[in-house]
Curated annotation (Swiss-Prot):
Keywords noted in UniProt: Aspartyl protease, Hydrolase, Protease, Repeat, Signal
Name of this protein: Aspartic proteinase Asp1
Disulfide bond in keyword set: no
Molecular-function GO terms, alphabetical: aspartic-type endopeptidase activity
A GO BP entry: proteolysis
Gene3D superfamilies in UniProt: Acid Proteases
Family per similarity comment: Belongs to the peptidase A1 family.
UniProt signal peptide: 1-23
Pfam families xrefs: TAXi_C (PF14541), TAXi_N (PF14543)
Cross-referenced PROSITE patterns: ASP_PROTEASE (PS00141), PEPTIDASE_A1 (PS51767)
Amino acid sequence: MTARLALLASLLLLLQLVPPSSAVVLELHGNVYPIGHFFITMNIGDPAKSYFLDIDTGSTLTWLQCDAPCTNCNIVPHVLYKPTPKKLVTCADSLCTDLYTDLGKPKRCGSQKQCDYVIQYVDSSSMGVLVIDRFSLSASNGTNPTTIAFGCGYDQGKKNRNVPIPVDSILGLSRGKVTLLSQLKSQGVITKHVLGHCISSKGGGFLFFGDAQVPTSGVTWTPMNREHKYYSPGHGTLHFDSNSKAISAAPMAVIFDSGATYTYFAAQPYQATLSVVKSTLNSECKFLTEVTEKDRALTVCWKGKDKIVTIDEVKKCFRSLSLEFADGDKKATLEIPPEHYLIISQEGHVCLGILDGSKEHLSLAGTNLIGGITMLDQMVIYDSERSLLGWVNYQCDRIPRSESAITSRL
């Protein structure tokens, strides 16, 4: 009896010593094709209004299009966010300083002393002002943040702005001081600067903040570059087929970017990949012939004798790719099976979901982006606490419930 009481006392003491970690789990909507976005529904403002935010680990600032009024704005699903003067963040506010630190620019403020900004993206730009408002976000510890700073974008310098898009704007999830994740941690909503996403090939998936959902085993981990503002495992070597030699002339600088629908390789690894894929098709699957796709984003496609419905119909014609990251004597391999780089178009063609970054995005300058298509059916974890990037095969169409780390450990 005395021994049992002692054991119980020890367990209670352990619970007091282990800091409670909380988790936020959010359902994802969308798909790689044809929607081209994975997004969450976020309720913002008081009273709250719903917005679709594209999850983007390649962007720092979360922002909405704003009726301030809005110039050159895109056609989006919901009514534009309308700020009030009380919501504006001033130039003197530390949040404004943090924003410009994240952007890597000297702080410049307009005559009204509000925190103005301009963000340049690969294919567009956004001009706006920093605001604060309520985000209705529930966590496993019951905490609900009062205010979150985000961008109020009132001028979008983007082509084809008259074309409707399926999302209202961006949920910035990269490393930085004004990211949503950093603000949630500073408010005590989560205790660890950890996030992850799980994108399902069936569509949808989930996003989580905090470390409570991270599996205790089976994850392939590799160090992240501590100095990089993006989530980069450094340089990786590209292989075609499991037993082949490297097809990249040199290790490739890699960034994991959930905001990129497709995967983008620099010119040399892209041409090498295209060459070996075509060579395999010419020798083993001559019934597939190259064709021009109506969707201009899909630059390399093949058609069969009949309309192709699923990747399984042509999977035997393609080989797996892999990226190998070295950390001393340790190696971490990201397997890229055909279903993680191929797309079946609406025309019934099979298309390469790896694009030439040197042509599509001229500013990439040799960087290779691992986009959503290559992260399908895997839990991808960005652990800034330990500077580790991890991935593990996962059934992403099953959304876990939010629970505290203490519960998951016992």
